[in-house]
């Protein structure tokens, strides 16, 4: 409140002070550090769609300025870690939604290229190289949205890029790209936050791209595509474009889980989702991708900013309902026992799928 949070460059030093405090107190114990988690998401929901604080709508200029300050906070935190003698792994985690062109029509192939530069590489290129994609920057300058950048900023970003040791990826879904005319859909249609399948509207940037439904993929109740191969696609793209090791910092399925009268939660859909994603991750490793870690989202059900407790991700069920309250007791789901078996077998159980790991 003092200076507007991420809207002010003052936050950069405050964030570095915070990071140094963590490095000083936990540096001898923590060997993997993520500076920022889903910077592209918290800034989009905060300054474009007004769904997260500070609740601003379509504030494009501030959105890109906020992101630049966040990049600087990330970079200076990375440099501080190394200056303090930190020898561990450090990077940022990006919510990656890989894209496929609708078809081989050139304008749709270009729509995919533009989408990737504006929605993916704008962040990952800074983390890995310390530079912004040229075509995307040219577009933002033309629109008047480009951030104000100090002379020394790019040098700091480039120096920090040389010190990160992995690219963090939060992967949930992929998308399709098609050319979007100037009078086409906007980025601000209805987002499915209710779990009513089919309620999400087609979104896009006018004159650039739109994201139609992928007819070849199933979706969750929240209209997120279920695309295990997309995870492999992400890893291959990062390996080829950046040459960095990868940490899968989030991957999981949000669903309407129900507890039976005998306190069982039969979430075979989550087991199948994770199994198929892990198999594709294994293929990515075989193809040369260096994957340092894989983290599922999440261990327990949790309170969502947008969906409350109705959208559940955990291996452990939390007895809490939207309207009726609950005991807050915890119950292990079938997926808990299945994943326990996967870990115990060092992944062998992925290739002999069955619901052996149910609660006793």
Predicted regions and their residues:
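Active-site region of glycoside hydrolase catalytic domains
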Residues: 1-353, 359
